[in-house]
């Protein structure tokens, strides 16, 4: 059985604070080529998630700790939707449709969420990274 414990979250928070990217993740899947990717992402408010999309793949985000805003964009870079997420808040889980431009802004140190999506993992290709910047921590 796999678990994400309070101790694991504490270790992830320390690691994310020390990481130059200001975030880290804890994989529940065994291999990067697993058919379903399952990971806990822990980050700090100054981490930058580039605006991206997953071609042909949905993404499920489930809040665990802290708070964030999920931004959904139109193809021209305008904001289509902004969803605030936090444990105990109105929105805890969001399924982002395939091919949807999005990014996250974290509001609290040690914000954690689970991400589930179809694998295998592959780095973003140019068609999956937006040609616009979107909302960034300094613009929020």
What are these regions (language model features)?
Residues 51, 70-71, 94-96, 102-107, ...:
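Short beta-strand His + acidic residue motifs that chelate non-heme Fe in jelly-roll/DSBH
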Residues 56-76:
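Glycine- and acidic-residue-biased ligand/ion/polar-headgroup-sensing regions
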Residues 40-57:
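Conserved short histidine dyad/triad with adjacent acidic residue
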Residues 40-42, 60, 93-95, 115:
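Conserved hydrophobic/aromatic beta-strand scaffold that supports enzyme active sites
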Residues 1-36, 81-86, 138-140:
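A short, N-terminal "cap"/entry segment at the start of jelly-roll beta-barrel domains
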Residues 11, 78, 103-140:
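Double-stranded beta-helix
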Residues 74-99:
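Short acidic-glycine-tyrosine-enriched beta hairpin
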């Amino acid at each position: 059985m796999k678990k994400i414990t309070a101790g694991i979250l504490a270790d992830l928070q320390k690691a994310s604070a020390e990481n130059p990217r200001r975030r880290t993740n804890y994989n529940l899947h065994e291999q990067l080529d697993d058919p379903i990717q399952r990971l806990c992402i822990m980050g700090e408010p100054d981490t930058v998630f580039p605006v991206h999309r997953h071609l042909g793949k949905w993404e499920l985000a489930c809040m665990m700790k802290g708070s964030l805003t999920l931004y959904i964009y139109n193809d021209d870079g305008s904001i289509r939707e902004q969803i605030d997420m936090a444990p105990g808040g109105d929105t805890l889980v969001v399924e982002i449709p395939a091919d949807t431009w999005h990014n996250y802004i974290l509001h609290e140190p040690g914000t954690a969420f689970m991400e589930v999506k179809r694998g295998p993992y592959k780095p973003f290709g140019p068609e999956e990274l937006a040609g616009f910047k979107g909302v960034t921590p300094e613009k929020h």
